């Protein structure tokens, strides 16, 4: 009988130990990897050393992202041990005075009053009846709707569902014995484990700074990655990787939480990130461990390229709408857009630093003035740009180049529908006078979109058919001079 009671007692002790929740926090980490995607998505791989019981374990994995998607969480053993996950709960209801009060409704608390004259503290017990817009307390002889001033509440404990930080609570079954050995019921051992999950609250974007040379024929280009962490936890000593490209997701993206980053950290520009292809995307890896604190924005160097050859273009683009009707004057002092263009490739025999895939982002361009001070001259957004592709940046509008455009003739030669559309044959003519106030000659690219089937009948300068629906002229305008471009076109709608 005594032996039976002793066995039952030992079994009860073992069960209590197994049921006891064991916490694990960031101090247990042996490795941390974070891969951030476009579109408020990241993959976190958190490796830790955890003390594990033989049999059922109750583990509180603390310091996870508050924006984690718990359905994506995956726990695995790094030591090859058998591990069976039975249950998991994502506890993101964080401990605050108000939450503690709300969870204590119906419970007994101790109310402590301070006597301002005597300085003596007096306490009595009360039951929390409500915690909405204040607190309602029921004492043995009365009900009060607020705390005494000065006064405070002492709670009996913290409810199990309230955490001081985001926590993934897990129940799993483990076998801690070496292969081929029997395991005592109360055996414990340290085991390497990795928790991986997808989360929001981690974003990245690329930004580029280009300095245009004095001759305006080359740029020095530096790329930066701006990382923002609003996920509710910090990632210290993390291996950081970035995915550029559009990853398909079956659920709509959640909007980023309305939080402002508290700090801005700038990293050294000397070590660009390493790039490689991954499936149909591109992966960028930081070659050192980094810290990304909660509510922090950090910048790290992406690339650095020197003396990248560029071409400047003045481009005046019209519209296809005025080819179908009679309009006369089409604009005075029209200003060409200024573009800067370069090819994402390394020149033969030159190590410019280009020739790698460029993530989408904003390129900001600067040029030094006569005193050597860099001045901002424009910016434009680029899409993901593969190796060998052309980057074209619109920087603004030309100040010293203007143009006047007018329609000089319009004839309906045939009508097969109401007015000119949806059917008809039209002949129309135009005049474009381009003036150059600069002290050097310029070449202006004139682009005229023309809908329908068209035929150029007359023109003062030869055009190129850039596409089926556009005519393009390259017009050289002398310094402080002007040139008039005329053309007549027949259009069938």
Language model regions located:
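N-terminal signal peptide c-region/cleavage motif recognized by signal peptidases
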Residues: 13-15
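Long, intrinsically disordered, low-complexity accessory segments associated with secretion
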Residues: 2-8, 17-493
């Amino acid at each position: 009988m005594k032996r039976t009671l002793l066995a039952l007692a030992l079994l009860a002790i073992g069960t209590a130990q197994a049921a006891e929740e064991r916490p694990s926090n960031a101090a247990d980490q042996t490795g941390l990897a974070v891969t951030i995607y476009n579109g408020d998505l990241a993959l976190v791989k958190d490796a830790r050393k955890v003390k594990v019981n033989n049999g059922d374990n109750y583990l509180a994995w603390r310091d996870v992202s508050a924006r984690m998607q718990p359905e994506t969480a995956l726990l695995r053993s790094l030591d090859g041990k058998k591990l069976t996950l039975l249950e998991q709960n994502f506890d993101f209801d964080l401990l605050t005075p108000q939450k503690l009060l709300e969870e204590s409704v119906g419970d007994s608390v101790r109310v402590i009053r301070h006597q301002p004259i005597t300085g003596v503290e007096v306490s009595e017990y009360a039951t929390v009846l409500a915690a909405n817009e204040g607190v309602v307390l029921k004492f043995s002889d009365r009900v009060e709707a607020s705390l005494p001033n000065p006064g405070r509440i002492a709670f009996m404990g913290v409810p199990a569902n309230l955490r001081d930080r985001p926590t993934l609570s897990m129940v799993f079954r483990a076998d801690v014995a070496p292969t081929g050995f029997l395991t005592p019921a109360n055996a414990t051992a340290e085991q390497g484990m990795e928790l991986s999950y997808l989360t929001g609250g981690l974003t990245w974007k690329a930004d580029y700074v280009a300095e245009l040379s004095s001759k305006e024929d080359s740029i020095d280009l530096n790329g930066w990655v701006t990382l923002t962490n609003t996920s509710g936890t910090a990632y210290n000593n993390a291996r950081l990787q970035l995915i550029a490209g559009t990853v398909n997701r079956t659920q709509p993206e959640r909007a980023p939480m309305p939080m402002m980053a508290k700090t801005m950290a700038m990293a050294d520009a000397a070590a660009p990130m390493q790039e490689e292809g991954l499936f149909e995307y591109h992966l960028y890896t930081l070659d050192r461990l980094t810290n990304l604190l909660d509510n922090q924005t950090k910048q790290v160097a992406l690339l650095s390229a020197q003396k990248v050859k560029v071409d400047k273009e003045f481009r005046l683009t019209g519209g296809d709408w005025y080819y179908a009707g009679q309009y006369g004057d089409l604009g005075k002092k029209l200003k060409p857009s200024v573009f800067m263009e370069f090819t994402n490739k390394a020149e033969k025999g030159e190590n410019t630093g280009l020739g790698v895939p460029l993530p989408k982002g904003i390129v900001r361009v600067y040029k030094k003035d006569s005193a050597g001070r860099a001045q901002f001259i424009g910016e434009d957004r680029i899409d993901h740009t593969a190796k060998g592709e052309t980057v074209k940046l619109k920087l603004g509008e030309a100040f010293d180049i203007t143009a006047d455009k007018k329609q000089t003739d319009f004839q309906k030669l045939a009508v097969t529908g109401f007015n000119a559309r949806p059917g008809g044959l039209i002949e129309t003519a135009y005049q474009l006078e381009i003036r150059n106030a600069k002290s050097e000659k310029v070449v202006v690219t004139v682009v005229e979109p023309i809908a329908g089937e068209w035929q150029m009948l007359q023109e003062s300068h030869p055009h190129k058919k850039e596409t089926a629906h556009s005519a393009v002229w390259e017009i050289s305008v002398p310094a402080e001079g002007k040139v008039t471009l005329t053309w007549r076109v027949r259009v069938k709608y």
